[in-house]
Amino acid sequence: MKPDRKSLLAVFNVLFTAHGPQYWWPGDSPFEIMVGAVLTQNTAWTNVEKAIANLVNHDKLSPAGIVAARKDHLANWLRPSGYFNVKAARLKNFCRWYIEAGGFTALSKVDTQALREALLAVNGIGPETADDMLLYAFDRPVFV
């Protein structure tokens, strides 16, 4: 028997009421959490932390900062996370979409399923990354 959405949400609510928010995913802002979700693809979290620190040290940990960064500079800052050229392109794609979509405030108002579909339409955002973003950045009741 496959559980339905209503049953899963009921279980989620019982667990959430009993245990509260877990703050499992590190990050100082929802945007940083989303950047981490892109960068953690195929690498260890310690490497992601180094890449995020590089963005912070170069004052580029913002959607506009990432979009404005030269691709070769961005790739170099992301080098610790592996596949740095691919991740630089994916992160720029994501940030362009994020800005065009109106940023966190506008995206927060979008229905969960519609937001998931929009995230999946961004080149480089797959199902697990989209679900990470929904759960940890947008506080949506989804399973990863």
What residue ranges belong to the model's regions?
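Catalytic cores of DNA base-excision repair glycosylases
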Residues: 2-144
